[in-house]
């Protein structure tokens, strides 16, 4: 099977069988998505969703968050992984949104990455979901699934991202990000992947190699 055939088969399956795939984070605005995505680093979406209602109630706008103390923000996100650094980054992010972007979440990945605490993955998530930018955010699930399926042999998230963007049509990239995340979260799990329940085994390089 050629690489193109594998991509065509995997994307074709998802397109035909999973026409709707969305983020499991809860948010109502680009600002809320940015905050939630920053909190989700090395933390589950479920835990983030339990935390953000109180945070968004206390700080409903970038202006409110920019004026907050790190200690007050920390008190609301203690159940999140790395709460101290995330509290510092959230306040710094909001302050830079005000000073550099008029309080508006920018659409460009490079601009988003100038915000404290915003790396390439977070920037790609926000640019893709909020603005429909043709980018693919590579988190641990996307990285794992892409390598197992044989969509990439990249050894870094950036290398996998470049492989995916080289082969996934631009109009499919925003939803392809969700396809791969959800597949990794519920089927192609890190420990004990559910291969017997996986509809992609016919095209999966890892499954084929383990079956030899």
Task: Specify the residue positions occupied by each region the protein language model found.
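Catalytic cores of DNA base-excision repair glycosylases
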Residues: 2-212
């Amino acid at each position: 099977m050629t690489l193109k055939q594998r991509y065509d088969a995997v994307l074709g399956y998802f397109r035909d069988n999973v026409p709707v795939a969305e983020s499991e984070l809860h948010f109502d605005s680009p600002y809320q998505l940015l905050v939630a995505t920053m909190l989700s680093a090395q933390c589950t979406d479920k835990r983030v969703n339990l935390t953000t209602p109180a945070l968004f109630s206390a700080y409903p706008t970038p202006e409110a968050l920019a004026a907050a103390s790190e200690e007050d923000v920390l008190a609301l996100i203690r159940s999140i992984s790395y709460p101290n650094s995330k509290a510092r980054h959230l306040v710094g992010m909001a302050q830079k949104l005000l000073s550099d972007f008029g309080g508006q979440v920018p659409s460009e990945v490079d601009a988003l990455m100038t915000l404290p605490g915003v790396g390439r993955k977070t920037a790609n998530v926000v640019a893709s979901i909020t603005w429909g930018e043709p980018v693919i955010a590579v988190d641990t699930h996307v990285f794992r699934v892409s390598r197992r399926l044989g969509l990439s042999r990249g050894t870094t998230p950036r290398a996998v991202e470049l492989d995916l963007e080289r082969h996934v049509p631009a109009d499919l990239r925003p939803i392809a990000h969700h396809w791969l995340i959800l597949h990794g979260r519920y089927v192609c799990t890190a420990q004990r992947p559910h291969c017997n329940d996986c509809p992609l085994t016919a095209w999966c390089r890892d499954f084929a190699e383990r079956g030899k």
